Amino acid sequence: MKRLTGLICFLCLLCSCREEAGRGVEQPMSQPIVSETASPDSMEVEEILPFERKPLTAADIILAKELLFDKYTLKDEYPYQDTVRSFKWDAIRKCLAFIENLQYDANRWAIFQNYKNVNREAPLVRKYTQNVYRRIADTLGVERYQSVPLYLPSDTLVPERYGRDGALVSFLGETGSFYRVSPVSIEGEWWVPRRYVKLLSDSTQFNHVVVVDRGDQNIATLERLEEGTWAIRGMNPATTGMHRPPYAQETPLGMFVVQQKKSRMVFLKDGSAATGGYAPYASRFTNGAYIHGVPVNVPRTAMIEYSWSLGTTPRSHMCVRNATSHAKFVYDWAPTERSLVIVIE
């Protein structure tokens, strides 16, 4: 079976998802057909060539508005202050076409996992820097904390770069204490110590996708109905992470898997071990980034449905803040380890 020839470059995903080409579907070997009109002594044999599926492009993707959550619904284009914001449907179609094409490959999927360094702090990469948060990062800006070390097949002593927690990868096999993987968002084959990789079920399909636009501060939920056809389940305002060292960070761009859910995600006050409050209906996709409802700060305990700040400017620490009822919708609707979160700009 022909493997995907190009992987997503999520630097391109800042504005749109790259269209993928070059994936075929392996079919059974061709079989001869005997002409019904031919005589037994002069049978003509026609050979049917193997069918090769043509990769989908953005133009092949059909989006149908079939909302399951219809509160605070935004229009395709809507005014914001002195400008116009929108849902970037062309970019979203490219992302969905990429996902469709991905799933025709016979790969087994896996996830990078190292939330709060639970699987051990990643070793230092060959070349690193210290960022404005005073944390070690590779030369591409991916922090060591909560990340996964990626080794070149030619050098398994010192990692070359880091992979983000929650990133979707294709499992290629195993060699010694390493898994060989091909991340969706990073080109090439990499070796990763087994402890940092969670293998998903062979039957895993990604039919639920959440697209977060940190440029226009909105969120779209989409569900696959059949090949090339996706239903839009919600179009809502959201608030993403802001760049404010040393505590608040931008929501990272890329494609991630929903890994964990908490009905109440407790958070701490900045620079303190004291509880600051909780965020309801939290679905975690990378590091400490969750899709969640409006935060509830102590001493309050009752949930808050909506905030005037939703859909305005980045305000979160890294999370994607939603109306609480919409966060509950995502919490109930998107199955863990079978749903994708794509962050674009």
Protein language model annotation of sequence segments:
Residues K2-I8:
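Sec-dependent signal peptide recognition
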Residues G22-E44, I62, Y80, W89-N107, ...:
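Exported/periplasmic cell-wall-interacting domains
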Residues I48-R53, I61-V118, R161-V197:
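SH3/SH3-like beta-barrel superfamily modules
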Residues R18-E20:
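Bacterial signal peptide processing site
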Residues L14-S16:
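C-terminal motif of bacterial Sec signal peptides marking the signal peptidase cleavage site
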Residues E174, P193-T301:
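Gly/Pro-biased beta-strand-loop elements
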Residues P153-G163, A231:
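SH3/SH3-like (including bacterial SH3b) beta-barrel domains
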